[in-house]
C-alpha cells in the first residue's frame, strides 16, 4: 500500500505547463438324541432273574453240599426234554471251597428238568423280542389275557436247539429281570444256596453277560417291559421304605436296585447334595410294568467278578470265597473294553441289543449337576466312575472349590482397574469408560475426586474431568473472555470463538474469510480496511480500491494527488489523459489540462497581459 505523494515540477526541455503523471500499483491484502422308551400293553411271560454265573449247569448232583439254583415250576413230563447241545462250554475245574449260596426252594429237581425250564424260558423270551422288533414301537399292541401261563414248548416234543438272540455290540447290557414279592425283614430272609463250583480267573474288564435265565416257583408272575438301551449316566437306587439291606463288601450300606414301572431315582455323582437330572422322555403309563401291590422288592445280587454287569475291580471275583449271606447292590452297566470280547458260554454279540428291565448304561461323562438334598449322607453313596474312589472324589471337589474361590468365574471378572491396578470382580463393582475398566470408587475426577459413575464427564488424554473442572482448563476467548467449549479459532496468537472473530467495522464473522489487522491490532475485513485506509481520489473523493476480482490497486499520482484511472481527465475538455505525447497532462495554475487546453489558456492570458501594457 502506498500513500499519495506529490512530485515537484521538473525543469526540462518540455513546454512550460506540461506535468508528467505517475501510475502506481498497490498490492491488496489479503469422518453356539432323543431316547424313546416304548411300553407295550401288559403281557405276562415267564419270570426271569438276572444272570448269575455262580453255578455250573453241567454239575451233576450227588456230592455233599452240592445244591443247585432254584428249580423251575414243575412240568408234566420233564424227562422228555433233553438238554440243548452246544450251549455251554465245558465246566471249569471244581473248587469245593469257592463260595456257597443258600437255596430258597430246596425241591428235588433233576438237572434235565432245570435245563428244560431254561430252554423254555429262552424260547419264550426270543419270541417276545421277535414280536417287539417286528412291530412298530409307536403302535399299541392289543391287550392279552393277564393270566397267561408260562410259555413253554410241549412236554412231548424234545427241545434240540434254541433260537439265538441277536444282541448289539453297543451298548453291551446284561439281561436283568426282577420279581415282586412282599418285603421281609433281613433276619427272616433266607438266601438261596448254590452248589459250589470251580474257580475261574477274574476278568480284568467288563464284558457282555449271556442271556442265562432261571425261574422260581415261589414268586408271582409279572409283566415284561422292554426298553431300547441308550447310553446315559448311571442310575442308582435311592433309599425308600420297605427295602432290605444286607452286609456288603464296601464300606457303606449297599442299596439294592428297586423294581418298578418307572425309572429309579437318579444317583449322586459327586456327593449327597447333587443328583443327575435325567433327560425328559415319555413317562411310563399307569398299568405297565409290575402290578404287584405288595411294595417294592429288592432282589439280592450275589457277588461276582467284574466281567458281569460292569462291576468295579474292588468286588469279589468270580469263584473267590464269599460269605453265604452276602447281598450286593446292583451296579450300573458299563461298556466292554474291547469290541468283540466274548466270555465262555455267551451268545455271539452283534447287531442292535435290547434288554429286559435294564437301567440305562453309564456314559463316559455325566450332564451338569443340580443341587438336591433328597439323600442323607450315609444312605446315598455317590455313584462315581470306576476309576475314582469316594475319597478321591471328595478331594477333587475340595480342590475345585478352593480354586473357584481364589479364581472367580470369568462372568464376574471384568478386568484390571486402570486407576488402582486391582482386579474388578463382581457385578456392580466396576464401570467402563474410555475403553478402560475402573472400580466405581476409582472412577473420579482427576482434579476434585468427585465420583463420575452415571455423570457426564470429559476425557482429555485418558483422564476424566467433571464438567466444572474441565471448563476451568479451557482457553478463554480474547473478545468475550469466556471459556471456549467448542471449536477454537486462533488468529494473531490469540484464541477466539468462531462467532466472536468479526470485523470491527461491519461486525461480520471472519471465520473462513480473509482479514487484515491495522496498526492498532484491530481486525478488519479487506473491504472495510480499504475503505478506511486506502487513498482517496482527488476528483471523486472515493477510496482507490482494487477492481472486482483483482488483488492489486491501480491509481494515478499527479501533482501529488491520487486519481482513479477513469478520473484522470482534462478539466476543460474532459478528455482522458494518459502518458502519450498528445494525451499527457499539462497542468496550469493547479488545473489538470491537456496540451490543447493548456495552450488555449496560455494565449488568453498572454493577450490580456498585452492589453494591460
Curated annotation (Swiss-Prot):
GO terms for molecular function: metal ion binding. GO terms for cellular component: cytosol; focal adhesion; nucleus; plasma membrane. Keywords: Acetylation, Activator, Cell adhesion, Cell junction, Cytoplasm, Isopeptide bond, LIM domain, Metal-binding, Methylation, Nucleus, Phosphoprotein, Repeat, Ubl conjugation, Zinc. InterPro entries: Znf_LIM. Residues 1-119, 133-259 are annotated as: Disordered. It is found in: Nucleus; Cytoplasm; Cell junction. The keyword Ion transport does not apply. It comes from the Eukaryota. The modification Phosphoserine is found at residues 117, 152. The keyword Ubl conjugation applies. Residues 41-55, 174-183 have a biased composition (Low complexity). Residues 415-474, 475-535, 536-604 form the LIM zinc-binding domain. Residues 26-40, 210-231 have a biased composition (Polar residues). SUPFAM superfamilies: Glucocorticoid receptor-like (DNA-binding domain). There is a cross-link at residue 328 (Glycyl lysine isopeptide (Lys-Gly) (interchain with G-Cter in SUMO1)). The modification Omega-N-methylarginine is found at residue 250. Fusion protein carrying the DNA-binding domains of HMGA2/HMGIC and the LIM domain of LPP causes malignant transformation of NIH3T3 cells. This is Lipoma-preferred partner homolog. It comes from Mus musculus.
